[in-house]
Amino acid sequence: STPKPVVVTPGSANRQAAELFRAAALATERRGIPSLFVTPWSDQLPSPLPEHVTHVQRAPFSALFPRAAAVVHHGGIGTTSQALAAGVPQVVQGRCFDQPDNGARLERLGVGRSLAAGDPEAGALFAALNALLDDPEVEPAARRWARAMRTDAGEPAMERAADLVEEASGAGPFSGARPPTR
């Protein structure tokens, strides 16, 4: 059977991703696995496109990510959360805003690796993919976090998140909490 692909996406608005795609093409070729590049900006792709790489302009991440071996991306919260919900390992090459922090958080959760900002090196991306795909603890951790995002003991995840915020603040459930006084 064909191995699951590594999905590579720099986000829908990133037009400065040529080096990410070049590095990903080299890293996945070296690893011997197919890759799927998702971007509307085909001028960012290596030319000619390597045989092991498929390109699509857009894809429904909620359907695509569960079928991926890993997702390599920019670390935006939308892509990060969709990959986390799919239970798939992630490599983040964040450049700005919350992206590097999102990558660091994925590392702490045991489901991702974060590359330094700037142009990615194929060797660093190859090493990050190997670390994720060869570590027997990463895939089960990714699946656990995906389950936790869906439910926690049958309770919807958003309700559980609100309860955790209340617990952390010391307020407890809202029904018994008093609003702050001035």
Feature-to-residue mapping (PLM):
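Donor-nucleotide binding loops and adjacent catalytic segments primarily
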Residues: 1-70
